[in-house]
């Protein structure tokens, strides 16, 4: 086998890995993770189980790689959609719309199943550090723009929203309530507490 043939095989496998990730993540999002077997992914793609296992050792590795790619794509999407926002409240509205659409397209079982895979759970926990950094910038900008109170303790605020997010996930509230209701009755109510009068008016426009 010459070098050109080796490169072609490598490119083919790389392309196939991408197709496998896309197919698997679509299936996980539609049916829940535990409901989808590796065999199902192979059948959907028309490839053998052997080929699939040559590229991904097991379902957790496949899910882990898929979540990483999805997370990167979502960060790019949010940056692209918010780059022209004039203030933090416009950013909040944009991210809210993205999250609502994301939840509408995803089976609640997907979120319930995620925590059952330790490698994925650890990755998501690590991602919280990035989210914390972005949230701190968001709060600081909100203060400078007059939407958030100057006496807000950023560290305590981060702990509050961490606790809220954990409570929603651990109690699977997304299975009983719409994402709109969760945001309006939990997230936005808590956010209102750090808003100035100007911020409350802007937040009410978003909720309304």
Regions found by a protein language model. Give the residues of each.
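Basic, helix-initiating cap at the start of DNA-binding domains
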Residues: 1-31, 35-47, 61
């Amino acid at each position: 086998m010459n070098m050109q043939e080796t490169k072609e095989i490598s490119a083919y496998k790389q392309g196939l890995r991408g197709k496998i990730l896309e197919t698997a993540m679509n299936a996980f999002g539609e049916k829940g993770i535990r409901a989808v077997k590796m065999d199902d992914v192979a059948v959907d793609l028309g490839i053998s189980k052997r080929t699939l296992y040559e590229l991904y050792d097991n379902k957790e590795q496949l899910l882990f790689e898929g979540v990483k790619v999805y997370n990167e794509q979502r960060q790019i999407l949010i940056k692209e959609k918010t780059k022209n926002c004039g203030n933090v409240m416009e950013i909040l509205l944009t991210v809210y719309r993205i999250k609502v659409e994301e939840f509408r397209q995803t089976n609640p079982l997907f979120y319930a199943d995620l925590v059952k895979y330790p490698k994925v759970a650890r990755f998501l926990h690590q991602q919280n550090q990035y989210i914390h950094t972005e949230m701190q910038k968001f709060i600081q900008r909100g203060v400078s723009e007059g939407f958030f109170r100057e006496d807000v303790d950023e560290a305590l605020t981060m702990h509050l929203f961490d606790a809220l997010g954990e409570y929603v996930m651990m109690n699977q509230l997304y299975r009983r309530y719409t994402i709109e209701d969760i945001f309006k009755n939990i997230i936005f109510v808590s956010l209102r507490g750090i808003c100035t009068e100007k911020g409350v008016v802007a937040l009410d426009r978003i909720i309304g």
